[in-house]
């Protein structure tokens, strides 16, 4: 099955997949082509039968989400926006900025005149480099909605000149920092109507829900702590909230199709889990429905059979887990994380080149050091990332963090069950494990000294 994927900058990529494969196979192939490791921030959108924009559930089969028509046309977009300093790859940052620019042009992100001038200069520096009178182009009218005056053009030009020498990556980072300060940065918008038929825009963000008029004029803001639950029934979504006086109120939002209603229902759960939870709860991750054939098979064959299974939510990691996972991938590739973007192919090539330069004995030592490092990471507190794991939650028994961090938690970050008490545990310390390993390898290292010197001499000869 052929798939055409459109990026935010209108570049179309082509991949071929099995129609019975999961949607994540498409995303993984696209991100691999672009050298992106931070896959979890992105998703694939398609247009529904009523013209609504919908997210493909990447955990389900492609044929369950869209019509198996070749070529399948999808859009690569940022699903979960994070702060610019949390983005570790330049390629990821570039796609973030392109998506943000698209949102500004559509009107869902609004800048004042001063911000628009600064953003125009940064975008020009990122796209065209240092200021040149004959080639300088600015997108002020696109992002601000008004044609610039002569004075405005001069101001943008002066701002652009002041950025001389700034690299493309740095200009994109500064532009993304500017946009991330806006109120609606990272908010996902859904078109709906209230119980009286008035057109609304429902925005789902990191802190809660924004209820706005069709022109983005705010009506009400619902923070996550006041939202009791959200349910979907057909084309309607019901959001139960708690008022200041303690009373519960149910808000009704109507949509053009059940798929659009399901989009808001999914967004509330997925965005809340991604930004505000330590880990995705199993009740969210494993929630699914079955078609008629799958239901019959589960009754007569096996309850755990995958036939006809369709996951409700498309969320597998939280923002903290994605960031930590990316750092580990960069670390395992032997690359220090300093906020600069590094392509996946470059990481892989760096690791291969390093391994090829090693002799067999040196490679064994390097592999052992990597294993020790992974062991040390596994025994380190997942919350503070400084102390060693020294506590177990009772009654669930999970060991996740140090005693100081565990004593401040009321529920287990792994299974979300309530914590009755925290039990002090004594695991082998990282220092003792590393000392033991060093003792075991000392004789081996001494015997290999001559070989290692030869390896080093060969390396120096190559560099010369």
Curated annotation (Swiss-Prot):
Pfam families: FERM_M (PF00373), FERM_N (PF09379), zf-C3HC4_3 (PF13920). E3 ubiquitin-protein ligase that mediates ubiquitination and subsequent proteasomal degradation of myosin regulatory light chain (MRLC). Regulates cell movements during gastrulation by acting downstream of fz7 to antagonize the frizzled-signaling pathway. The gene is mylipb. It catalyses: S-ubiquitinyl-[E2 ubiquitin-conjugating enzyme]-L-cysteine + [acceptor protein]-L-lysine = [E2 ubiquitin-conjugating enzyme]-L-cysteine + N(6)-ubiquitinyl-[acceptor protein]-L-lysine. It comes from the Eukaryota. PROSITE patterns: FERM_3 (PS50057), ZF_RING_2 (PS50089). The keyword Zinc applies. SMART domains: B41, FERM_C. This is E3 ubiquitin-protein ligase MYLIP-B. Interacts with anxa5. Pathway: Protein modification; protein ubiquitination. It comes from Danio rerio (Zebrafish).
């Amino acid at each position: 099955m052929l798939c055409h994927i459109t990026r935010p900058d209108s570049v179309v990529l082509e991949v071929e997949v099995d129609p019975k494969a999961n949607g994540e196979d498409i995303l993984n192939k696209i991100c691999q082509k672009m050298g992106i490791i931070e896959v979890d921030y992105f998703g694939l959108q398609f247009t529904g039968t009523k013209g609504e924009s919908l997210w493909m559930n990447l955990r389900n089969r492609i044929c369950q989400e869209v019509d198996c028509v070749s070529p399948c046309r999808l859009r690569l977009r940022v699903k979960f926006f994070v702060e610019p300093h949390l983005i570790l790859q330049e390629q990821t940052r570039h796609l973030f900025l392109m998506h943000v620019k698209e949102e500004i042009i559509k009107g869902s992100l609004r800048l004042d005149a001063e911000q628009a001038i600064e953003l125009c200069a940064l975008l020009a520096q990122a796209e065209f480099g240092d200021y040149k009178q004959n080639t300088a182009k600015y997108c002020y009218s696109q992002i601000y909605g008004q044609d610039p005056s002569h004075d405005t053009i001069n101001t943008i030009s002066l701002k652009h000149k002041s950025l001389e020498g700034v690299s493309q990556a740095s200009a994109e980072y500064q532009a993304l920092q500017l946009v991330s300060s806006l109120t609606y940065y990272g908010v996902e918008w859904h078109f709906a109507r209230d119980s009286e038929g008035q057109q609304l825009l429902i925005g789902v963000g990191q802190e809660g829900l924004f209820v706005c008029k069709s022109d983005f004029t705010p009506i009400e803001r619902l923070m996550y702590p006041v939202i009791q639950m959200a349910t979907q029934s057909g084309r309607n979504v019901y959001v139960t909230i708690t008022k200041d006086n303690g009373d519960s109120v149910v808000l009704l939002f109507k949509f053009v199709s059940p798929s659009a209603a399901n989009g808001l229902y999914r967004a509330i759960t997925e965005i809340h889990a991604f930004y505000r939870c330590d880990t995705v709860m199993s009740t969210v991750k494993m929630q699914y429905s079955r078609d008629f054939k799958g239901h019959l098979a589960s009754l007569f064959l096996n309850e755990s059979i995958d036939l006809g299974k369709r996951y409700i939510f498309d969320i597998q990691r939280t923002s903290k887990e994605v960031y930590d996972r990316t750092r580990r991938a960069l670390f395992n590739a032997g690359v220090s994380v300093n906020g600069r973007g590094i392509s996946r192919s470059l990481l892989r090539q760096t690791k291969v080149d390093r391994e090829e330069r090693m002799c067999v004995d040196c490679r064994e030592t390097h592999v052992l050091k990597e294993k020790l490092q992974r062991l040390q990471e596994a025994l380190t507190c997942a919350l503070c990332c400084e102390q060693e794991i020294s506590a177990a939650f009772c009654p669930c028994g999970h060991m996740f963090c140090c005693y100081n961090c565990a004593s401040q938690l009321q529920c287990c970050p792994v299974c979300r069950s309530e914590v009755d008490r925290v039990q002090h545990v004594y695991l082998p310390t990282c220092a003792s494990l590393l000392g033991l390993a060093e003792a075991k390898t000392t004789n081996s290292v001494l015997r290999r000294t001559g070989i290692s010197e030869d390896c080093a001499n060969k390396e120096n000869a190559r560099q010369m």
